[in-house]
Amino acid sequence: MLKKPISRLVFTFFAGSVLYASPFCMEQASAINNLMELFSKKTKPAPVYESPVDGNNQLKVQDPSQLKVQDPSLSEKSQNKAIKKPNIEQIKRATIASPKPFDYKPERLVPIKFPAIDLIETNSTVKSSTPFGLPLSARYNVILESDASKDEQATTEFRLADLSAVDAEAEQSIAGLVIHYYEQNPKLLWSQDGEVVTKAKDILLFFSHLDDDGLEPQDYLVKMPDENLFGEERQRALANFDVTLTSRILRYIQDASNGRIIANRLSPFHDLPRKEIDFGGELNRIAKSENTIAILKSYLPQSDYYLTLKKALAELPEARHNDNIKIAAQTVIKPGETNDNLPKFTALLLSRAPSGYLSEHKAILQNLNGEKNYNGQLVDAIKDYQKFVNKTADGIIGPSTIGTLVNNNVDVKRQKIINSMERLRWLPHDFGSRYVLINQAAYRAQYVENNEIRLDMKVVVGSPQRQTYFFYDRIRLVTFNPSWGVPNSIVVNEMLPRILQDSGYLQRNNYQLFDSSGKPVSASAVNWQKVASNGRGISIRQTPGKTNALGELKILFPNKHDIYLHDTPNKAAFSRDMRALSHGCVRLEYPREMAAAVLGKNVDDLKPYFAKGERSISLGQPVPVYLTYFTAWPDLKTGRINYYDDVYSRDALMAGATEKTDSVRQQNM
């Protein structure tokens, strides 16, 4: 080390060399010093830098974070004390928080109020609009001003008066539709000659079995009119029944088509538009059809996924409350060990393991039940179980393996199936002839063509704090040798602290810097104090290469969430059971195979695209991609249901939303 300050001439040469090697470094050192108020506002002699030298007494260019800043105004003894590295924790730095779940709000119920009608005074005058602002049809006037007999007019008058006395409630959107429908069709749909028609009874019978589809029958059932009522009371009861049943049919159409729970009210991570429905047209279709039940069934999903889940729900046994076996949450039992919890785990397997597994292993487990020494046949049986439930087959009985039994008793399985059926109602009911399906809870991706799974691979999805969104789109582009535009949340929350601490971080990792207008800038031109405080002003891009976070390709379906599928240089994560590790995008285990599939090519056909430079290829026909979350999902080859951990706590959100929906709807039972 030089013992005395070097000359300004040498320093100029040295500083220029450092700036050439890393243009960010000198400016950052200055910015950090300013941020930490290491220097007072008084004018002081300019600092000089003491640099290490090599054996030939030649200056060595290095990271200025290692250089000592010397202030000539200080004594030599106080130099080292004054030049401590800035405390980054003291910098006032903006952060971008993760979205939080919403406080779920079910659609509230409102009275179905028809306008008052006075035919005697007005001879066909009614209010100009409904309480919901819907214009009234002129059909009333047409009917009443026709050449119909006085008896017909009296019947119409009586019928309309019945409707104005209806005492029923429905969701606000449905109430308005019901009123508008009866305005245009002023007659009762579900009764004739004072009796409820057979079609209405068939509909109610269908509704009574909707628990087979994971729905709540009481949401749709309507009490039959009292048989002991006669005359005007009977007619009013029939009118009330008619309007109420119509509102429940519309509720059913909505729930079956779009889901009982409104997905986008659960959390910002749900982005699932509600399907548009011509309720008036559907109601007419039901009223006129000779096959009403077939129409009602058609509103539910009819995919193999849905029907397999429905079958599994029906086949679940009644909940058993006598297998109250408890194992400590952090229990770990390795092959060769002796453990008092081993008999409990064996008993859990016998009680709760899937029948497909027990059909082959039940005899062995029964013979070894009570055994505390973990070896031999029992280890093999546990490995087979781990394979069966898609866990790492290492024979280690840990929280992940235990959780497949403790967290999946009959009640839990039933609710997971019901949740999965509900989530299928949120999605398009026809996925298409070819599509990509990501199940975030399973950490898996599949490419499906003509109902056949052509590809099935592991994926890494967003962490619980940076969840992958639940939505669907269409794949349109594959980019080879991609650059990476770093999301602002990553820049602000993760990269800025590294940049402020390590002046060579950007250059070493092949990052480029851009100002707010998109113009390339050097790090030395950035006001890092301002960027750190407001979280804006720059963008960062990583150039293509082996260390690029996106690996050698990305598969794009442009969306507002900046989510896409991509390769990764970090392959080790695929060996883990819990793979919710990314910032939200989906890392593919076999990216080349997936890219070839969506492009309609063979994997070998892609080799020229990796030769040199960033290059994008558009899909001739966009491929639907569904980024979903199912904690119960069928294997269509075997019909077996696989159950997965609720890594994002979305089942818990569903439970809360379901409870609130039950509370609102039960008010009108």
Where does each model-flagged region fall?
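Well-ordered beta-sheet/strand-loop patches within structured domains
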Residues: L2, N34, L38, P45, ...
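Bacterial N-terminal signal peptides that target proteins for export
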Residues: L2-F13
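Bacterial N-terminal signal peptides
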Residues: F11-P23
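Signal peptide processing junction and immediate N-terminal pro/mature segment
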Residues: A21-K41
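Conserved, well-structured beta-alpha core segment at the onset of a catalytic domain
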Residues: C25-Q28, L229, N451, L455
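Flexible, low-complexity segments enriched for small/polar residues
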Residues: A154, D162-L229
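Amphipathic alpha-helical segments that form the core helices of the histone-fold
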Residues: A200-I203, D226-E232, R236, V379-Q386
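Mature extracellular/secreted ectodomains of secretory-pathway proteins
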Residues: S208-R274
